[in-house]
């Protein structure tokens, strides 16, 4: 699986066991991602932070 990184057009290949891509952003600024990468399980959203996870190449 390949996931986008925060830098535009950059991506990385996920290590074994991390089979989800995620995008994290602040609830107050939903159009501006704060963090992107590979993850093993989708974290829960909170009042301040929202996570979007997916499982296809570079879907984040």
Curated annotation (Swiss-Prot):
Disulfide bonding pattern of the chain: 3-21, 14-38, 42-53, 54-59
Cellular component per GO, a single term: membrane
Keywords: Cardiotoxin, Cytolysis, Disulfide bond, Membrane, Secreted, Target cell membrane, Target membrane, Toxin
Keyword field contains Secreted: yes
Location of the protein in the cell: Secreted; Target cell membrane
GO terms, biological process: killing of cells of another organism
Chief place of localization: secreted
InterPro entries: Cytotoxin_Cobra, Snake_3FTx, Snake_toxin-like_sf, Snake_toxin_con_site, Toxin_cobra-type
UniProt KW Lyase keyword: no
Tissue: Expressed by the venom gland.
GO molecular function, one term: toxin activity
Subunit (UniProt): Monomer in solution; Homodimer and oligomer in the presence of negatively charged lipids forming a pore with a size ranging between 20 and 30 Angstroms.
Functional note: Shows cytolytic activity on many different cells by forming pore in lipid membranes. In vivo, increases heart rate or kills the animal by cardiac arrest. In addition, it binds to heparin with high affinity, interacts with Kv channel-interacting protein 1 (KCNIP1) in a calcium-independent manner, and binds to integrin alpha-V/beta-3 (ITGAV/ITGB3) with moderate affinity.
Family statement drawn from the similarity comment of this UniProt entry: Belongs to the three-finger toxin family. Short-chain subfamily. Type IA cytotoxin sub-subfamily.
Protein name: Cytotoxin 5
Lineage of the organism: Eukaryota, Metazoa, Chordata, Craniata, Vertebrata
């Amino acid at each position: 699986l390949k996931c986008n990184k925060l830098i535009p057009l950059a991506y990385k290949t996920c290590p074994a066991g991390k089979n989800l891509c995620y995008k994290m952003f602040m609830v107050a600024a939903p159009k501006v991602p704060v963090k992107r990468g590979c993850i093993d399980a989708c974290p829960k959203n909170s009042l301040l932070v929202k996570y979007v996870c997916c499982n296809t190449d570079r879907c984040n």
